[in-house]
Every structure is written in structure tokens, then in C-alpha cells.
């Protein structure tokens, strides 16, 4: 999966990590969208075993951004992080009465993309909420398109009761 971003970014991958992708995703969801320093702090205290390899990959992506691209580590954000399924090693566990149960040792490929986004004080003074509100006000004040044909009033559909009474009155020969 290739991700294109408007901000400068760096990537790191850990392949064939001996942790289930489902358990890795549980940890990954804690750090998505956070700053690298916050993410590493969260993972340092997370009790899950998958937090260690995820923290290693995030640290590697931050080091790649700093050394390869010359980005400031203080502005790095965990933009994209995901765990794909790797190959599964299959083992046999002997059980009673000649049976054998299969053990699946799952692996995962963990990918992290960090972006260098400007800090909040370097951004414009308006909040994103204020920018959205301005955009909606501008859309509301824009002149609406005029339709070429004026709409004709919709005809009222006859109900079953009305149609039955009209049929009966026609059969009687009277007009109601």
C-alpha cells in the first residue's frame, strides 16, 4: 500500500514479527494520529506484548525521518500505521487417544508512516472548526442555481376509498 501525503514523511516496516496481527492492531489503535513522543510513551506503559515491536517500528520511522530526510523529531506525527498478516507457521500438539490439534503461530508485517506536520503555534490562528464554519457560511451565501423550468404542482394521488366511492356513484348514475 503506497500512501502519498502533502507533508514530508518517512516509513519503517517490521516484517515477520512473531505477534498476531489482531493483537498488534489492538495496540496500533492506541497510537494512530498521535505525536511520536506521545506514542512511544503510551507504548512504554501498555501491558500488551505487541507494544514492544510496534514501539520499535515507530522509533525506527522517526530515526529514518531524522537521518534520511532531515526532519525535526518534535514535529513528527504517526500518520499511518497498520499491521498486515504474515505467513502462519503450523505446528502439531499431540492430544489424547491419538488425536492431534493444530497450533497456528501467526506473524505480522507492521508498517508505520510518520509525517512532519507544523506545530500548532506555527499553523494559522484559526481552529479547524472555525475554518469549517467559514466554508459552510460561504456555501450558504452563494447564489442558488435557478432551474430553467418552473416546477408544476404535484397531482394528488387518488386513494382507494375515493376511487371506490366514485365508481359506486357512477354506477348509481348520480353525482356526488
Swiss-Prot record:
Start-end of Low complexity biased regions: 136-152
Residue ranges, compositional bias (Basic and acidic residues): 159-176
Gene Ontology biological-process annotations: translation
Keyword field contains Mitochondrion: no
Keywords: Ribonucleoprotein, Ribosomal protein, RNA-binding, rRNA-binding
Gene Ontology CC terms, in alphabetical order: cytosolic large ribosomal subunit
Gene3D superfamilies documented for this protein: Ribosomal protein L22/L17
InterPro entries: Ribosomal_uL22, Ribosomal_uL22_bac/chlpt-type, Ribosomal_uL22_bac/org-type, Ribosomal_uL22_CS, Ribosomal_uL22_sf
NCBIfam families: rplV_bact (TIGR01044)
Membership in a protein family: Belongs to the universal ribosomal protein uL22 family.
Assembly and oligomerization: Part of the 50S ribosomal subunit.
Listed name of the protein: Large ribosomal subunit protein uL22
